[in-house]
Amino acid sequence: MATMARSFLQAISKDEAVAPPLRVVQIEGLAVLKIIKHCKEFSPTLVTGQLLGLDVGSVLEVTNCFPFPVRDDDEEIEADGANYQLEMMRCLREVNVDNNTVGWYQSTVLGSYQTVELIETFMNYQENIKRCVCIIYDPSKADLGVLALKALKLSDSFMELYRGGNFTGEKLREKNFSWMDIFEEIPIKVSNSALVSAFMTELETDTPVSQGDYDRLHSSTTPFLENNMEFLIKCMDDLSMEQQKFQYYYRNLSRQQAQQQAWLQKRRTENMARKSAGEEPLPEEDPSNPIFKAIPEPSRLESFLITNQVSNFCGQINGVAGQNFSRLYLTKALHDN
């Protein structure tokens, strides 16, 4: 019996050590509606909420969620946030709702979610939850007939770098790490129970074409394109400022290296004279000399995040432009006929 128990425990520990990678986030339709309702009601204010569910193998099931209250005072948020979450967990437990935290959701404006604050929140969740996700919802895309819902997690390689706090160019080249390796997008699968699916089938009308289908044919997306261009220009300015920081760093580094070479040449000449006089040579390095003090290299994390945002805005502009061209060609063909 003891041998069987020991084998069982070894099998459990082995399964826990070799956890399958996360392949899909399965979210209930009710949770999706709650997220959309919360983000839409407070738009353009950014809001967040807690995700509840189960971690089953390679699938992360999100069965429910609840919103976090919106407060202006950061100190008030810190004081009341923990108590609010505990009270909500207790209430959900009493009504037999899954109360296991699997991550959080948050709204965004035009997909500009790649920030240091998001990474810090991820790392805080990672202390207690090994596999947590963040579901991002963009209410601004709802007017275009798009359900802008995506699930994100931090890559393992990025978390290793972040814990080490080393985002220098040498370290990034050693790890072969680029700005595209920060986030991993997990596919989302929306699921409903059989009763809900049957009920939705009953509610579905027999009309083959709805007003939403006509709305998707509208080519007027001027505000969306303008906002994307405005955000893109701002990101390019921020990226230019980051590049100026690195240019300033490399100028100082080159100046320091030139000063070090001049100092070493002078010291070697002095040592040759001392040897000729029969005196002990002086050390060629002087740690007390300011020119030998290492200049700290700026972190590349901020520039990587800004590059992520630039790529996101370019992708959105490209997508909307492509859709509008398709609509224009369709309209032209109908007009010609």
UniProtKB/Swiss-Prot annotation:
SMART domains: JAB_MPN (SM00232). GO terms for biological process: abscisic acid-activated signaling pathway; formation of cytoplasmic translation initiation complex; positive regulation of translational initiation; response to abscisic acid; response to auxin; response to glucose; response to maltose; response to sucrose. In response to auxin (NAA), phosphorylated at Ser-178 by ATPK1 and binds to polysomes via TOR signaling. This phosphorylation is repressed by Torin-1. Keywords: Abscisic acid signaling pathway, Cytoplasm, Initiation factor, Phosphoprotein, Protein biosynthesis, Translation regulation. GO terms for cellular component: eukaryotic 43S preinitiation complex; eukaryotic 48S preinitiation complex; eukaryotic translation initiation factor 3 complex; extracellular region; ribosome. Residues 267-278 have a biased composition (Basic and acidic residues). Its main location: cytoplasm. It comes from the Eukaryota. The modification Phosphoserine is found at S178. Disruption phenotype: Pleiotropic growth defects throughout development including postembryonic growth retardation, and delayed shoot and root growth, flowering, and senescence. Lethal at 80 percent at the vegetative rosettes stage. Reduced fertility. Compromised translation efficiency of specific 5' mRNA leader sequences. Requires exogenous sugar to transit from seedling to vegetative development, but hypersensitive to elevated levels of exogenous sugars (e.g. sucrose, maltose and glucose). Enhanced sensitivity to abscisic acid (ABA). Impaired uORF-RNAs polysomal association. GO terms for molecular function: metallopeptidase activity; mRNA binding; translation initiation factor activity. Mostly expressed in roots and flowers, and, to a lower extent, in leaves, stems and siliques. Residues 267-290 are annotated as: Disordered. Residues 25-158 form the MPN domain. The keyword Protein biosynthesis applies. It is found in: Cytoplasm. Belongs to the eIF-3 subunit H family. Component of the eukaryotic translation initiation factor 3 (eIF-3) complex, which is involved in protein synthesis of a specialized repertoire of mRNAs and, together with other initiation factors, stimulates binding of mRNA and methionyl-tRNAi to the 40S ribosome. The eIF-3 complex specifically targets and initiates translation of a subset of mRNAs involved in cell proliferation (Potential). Regulates translation initiation of specific 5' mRNAs harboring multiple upstream open reading frames (uORFs) in their 5' leader sequence (e.g. BETA-OHASE 2 and LHY). Component of the eukaryotic translation initiation factor 3 (eIF-3) complex. Interacts directly with TIF3A1, TIF3B1, TIF3C1, TIF3E1 and TIF3F1. Associates with the CSN (COP9 signalosome) complex. Binds to CSN1, CSN7 and CSN8. Interacts with ATPK1. This is Eukaryotic translation initiation factor 3 subunit H. It comes from Arabidopsis thaliana. The gene is TIF3H1.
